[in-house]
């Protein structure tokens, strides 16, 4: 088995933005709070971090800043995937140079590559990387599913160490665990499937929920690992209404609204994303009040 990047919960952290750019003062506050609350790792410039609307310079600077702010206290995983393999390689090399502990490589989107194309793209990026690579399968966003058979081929690469599985397809994830569970780590990419994926041998979750509940999300994982499966199950189900509210509009619109309500950023997202509808936001805030988050 390859070295595990992290065990437990990693926050797919929002990027605090204003009309003028990234708000690094608020970003620092959010990172510090995450670490104080016991998060196990931080993923910067992922889907939730609005990487797709950051400029190239902002993307690189956000990675560098996060690594510097965290200062080795927890692993930092940089989102460096792209539908342009050459650019993914450029970002991946940069992340390694500035000290990221690993990179997260989303399946190339829009191009609708064949499985052979996915294999060649991920291999090329992993070959160029100085740090471990985590694959990221999210077909609802990319229009392209990374099949278990393809992951089994990629799992033979020494630098590909894990996969974030956000397909939502438990049958596919079970097949994945059967094929590669002894070769690479599997992380849930969906907050409503943390415990089910842990039960298949998963090592944790790359989470949206942990933007606002890092301690509880980490505890859910560690309760399971420590044998308190009933406690983990209860947390999973108790937090389900809040999880659903965080996905009632496309991520990261609700996550940004929630983090904003806690005072860590402005409720600002870049077009084509728009801020949360008032009725949905009020439902989210009501659930947050019930959890004493605001």
What are the residue ranges of the model-derived segments?
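Active-site beta->alpha loop and helix N-cap motifs at the rims of alpha/beta catalytic domains
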Residues: 2-11, 15-143
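Catalytic cores of TIM-barrel enzymes
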Residues: 2-5, 37, 175-178, 184, ...
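C-terminal alpha-helical cap/extension of soluble enzyme domains
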Residues: 5-15, 33, 37-39, 199-202, ...
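Glycine-rich phosphate-binding "P-loop"
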Residues: 137, 159-160, 270-271
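Catalytic alpha/beta core domains of metabolic enzymes, predominantly
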Residues: 127, 141-247
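Alpha-helical structural signal in soluble globular domains
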Residues: 61, 65-70, 94, 98, ...
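Alpha-helix N-capping/helix-start residues
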Residues: 19, 24, 56, 148, ...
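A general structural signal for well-ordered alpha-helical segments in protein cores
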Residues: 6, 27, 59, 63, ...
């Amino acid at each position: 088995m390859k070295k595990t990047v992290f065990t437990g919960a990693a926050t797919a952290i929002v990027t605090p933005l204003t009309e003028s750019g990234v708000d690094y003062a608020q970003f620092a506050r959010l990172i510090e709070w995450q670490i104080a609350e016991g998060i196990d790792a931080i993923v910067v410039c992922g889907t939730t971090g609005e990487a797709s609307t950051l400029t190239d310079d902002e993307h690189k600077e956000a990675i560098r800043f996060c690594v510097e702010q965290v200062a080795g206290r927890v692993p930092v995983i940089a989102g460096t995937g792209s539908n342009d393999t050459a650019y993914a390689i450029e970002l991946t090399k940069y992340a390694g140079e500035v000290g990221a502990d690993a990179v997260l490589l989303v399946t190339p989107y829009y191009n609708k590559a064949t499985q052979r194309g996915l294999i060649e793209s991920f291999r090329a990026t992993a070959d160029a990387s100085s740090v471990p690579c985590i694959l990221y399968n999210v077909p609802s966003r990319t229009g392209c599913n990374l099949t278990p058979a393809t992951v089994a081929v990629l799992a033979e690469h020494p630098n590909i160490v894990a996969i974030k599985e956000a397909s939502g397809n438990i049958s596919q994830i079970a097949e994945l665990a059967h094929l590669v569970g002894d070769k690479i780590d599997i992380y849930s990419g969906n907050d409503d499937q943390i415990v089910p994926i842990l039960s298949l041998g998963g090592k944790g979750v790359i989470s949206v929920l942990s933007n606002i509940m890092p301690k509880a999300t980490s505890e859910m994982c560690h309760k399971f690992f420590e044998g308190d499966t009933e406690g983990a199950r209860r947390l999973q189900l108790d937090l389900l209404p809040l999880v659903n509210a965080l996905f009632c509009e496309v991520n990261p619109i609700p996550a940004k609204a929630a983090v904003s309500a806690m005072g860590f950023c402005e409720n600002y997202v870049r077009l084509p994303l728009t801020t949360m509808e008032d009725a949905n936001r009020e439902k989210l805030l009501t659930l947050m009040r019930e959890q004493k988050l605001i």
